[in-house]
């Protein structure tokens, strides 16, 4: 059975913990899109890990961890992550890398950084991980697949063609030093040896696992509102964040995905620029940021403080619909225990009219939040394992969200560790 774990919002919803929990039951965990631009945090007996490329099943003995064809593969960062987890005592994980995955090139990161500098106050808030230039090259058909590392003659000829184009950009748009083909080729040869032990025809392996009835977990990155088609364009990422793309990024038929677990947080947070209707500011935001997560709300990749806001029912309902959610995991409920009252955004006022539909970006810019206020629960709820043992105010909060988003909330996370979860 194939299950996808994806985000309903801007990312940072707590998917890492939920994926880690399901990974303990999975034969195979697959990253199907994105790159090292966002991190999943998991906490277990080995320690705390912010994983950027490795699937969240790396700490599970016997689990096959696959980096699929849809991933932006930064080989150096992948190897560093493997070394990081094994140095913490995690047994050498079983990792496979798709031969069709495309490689993050050094100039992708450079161009990402230079473009943000050029845009100045109009920048996108990129993590400068090279994601947009990478996917631009992929769809312009000048990217490099892993399999091409093993054909030296073809690789050098292609590098010469691609560098000619990149050097025009570097010299005339960004006024930066140009690329040296020989240096880049030598670098690619080093990458080849680093990734060689992991390369496989993962699509074939995954399809066989589906036929054999294995438990397969598709691990998404970021969330619905960062999808390039259905997100808050242009403040989005460059690969689809939706469960539907999981089939493409792993190499299986779409009808094989039987469950879509969509993750949302009990409040809202976002990194980077873009519309955020329920955002809060100042001391109110700082308090929520410091109470959030397991060590405050700061980006796992950049360390930047996340923007904070109240739970947005409009955005989350839309995010769940875009994902095709069959069930929801609500995370970080315990982080709200300091509040006397909790607000939820239940509608948007746009040009004097209230709507519960999530609009396109041009209208979203005009939206003002419509709030309801609920009483807080003002007590430590960590350690509680049954829903009906939660304070009534906490139960009411969860049930209100469930009614608003229209998808059953099956999991409620009340702490950062894997075992701190309530199954309904």
PLM regions and their residue ranges:
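Non-transmembrane, aqueous-exposed alpha-helical and coiled segments at domain scale
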Residues: 1-424
């Amino acid at each position: 059975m194939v299950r996808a774990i994806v985000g309903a919002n801007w990312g940072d919803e707590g998917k890492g913990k939920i994926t880690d929990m399901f990974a303990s039951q999975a034969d195979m965990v697959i990253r199907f899109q994105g790159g090292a631009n966002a991190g999943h945090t998991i906490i277990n007996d080995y320690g705390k890990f912010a994983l950027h490329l490795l699937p969240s099943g790396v700490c599970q003995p016997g689990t096959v961890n696959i980096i699929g064809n849809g991933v932006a593969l930064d080989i150096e960062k992948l190897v560093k992550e493997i070394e990081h987890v094994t140095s913490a005592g995690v047994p050498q994980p079983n990792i496979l890398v798709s031969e069709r995955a495309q490689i993050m090139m050094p100039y992708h990161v450079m161009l990402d950084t230079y473009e943000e500098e050029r845009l100045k106050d109009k920048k996108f808030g990129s993590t400068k991980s090279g994601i947009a230039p990478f996917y631009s090259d992929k769809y312009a058909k000048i990217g490099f697949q892993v399999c091409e590392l093993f054909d030296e003659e073809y690789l050098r000829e292609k590098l010469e063609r691609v560098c000619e184009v990149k050097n025009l950009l570097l010299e005339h748009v960004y006024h930066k030093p140009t690329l040296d083909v020989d240096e880049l080729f030598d670098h690619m040869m080093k990458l080849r040896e680093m990734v060689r032990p992991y390369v496989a025809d993962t699509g074939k392996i995954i399809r066989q696992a589906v036929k054999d009835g294995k438990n397969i977990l598709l691990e998404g990155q970021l969330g619905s509102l960062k999808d390039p088609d259905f997100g808050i364009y242009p403040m989005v990422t460059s690969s689809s964040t939706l469960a539907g793309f999981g089939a493409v990024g792993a190499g299986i038929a779409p009808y094989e995905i039987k469950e879509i677990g969509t993750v949302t947080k009990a409040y809202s947070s976002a990194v980077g620029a873009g519309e955020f209707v329920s955002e809060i500011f100042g001391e109110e935001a700082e308090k929520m940021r410091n109470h959030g997560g397991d060590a405050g709300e700061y980006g796992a990749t950049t360390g930047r403080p996340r923007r904070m806001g109240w739970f947005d029912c409009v955005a989350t309902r839309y995010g769940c619909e875009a994902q095709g959610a069959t069930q929801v995991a609500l995370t970080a409920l315990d982080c709200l225990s300091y509040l006397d009252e909790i607000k939820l955004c239940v509608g948007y006022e746009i040009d004097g009219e209230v709507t519960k539909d999530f609009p396109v970006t041009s209208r979203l810019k005009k939206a003002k939040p419509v709030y309801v206020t609920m009483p807080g629960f003002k007590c430590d709820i960590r350690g509680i394992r049954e829903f009906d043992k939660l304070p009534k105010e906490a139960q009411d909060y969860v049930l209100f969200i469930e009614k608003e988003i229209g998808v059953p909330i099956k999991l409620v996370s009340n702490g950062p560790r894997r075992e701190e979860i309530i199954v309904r």
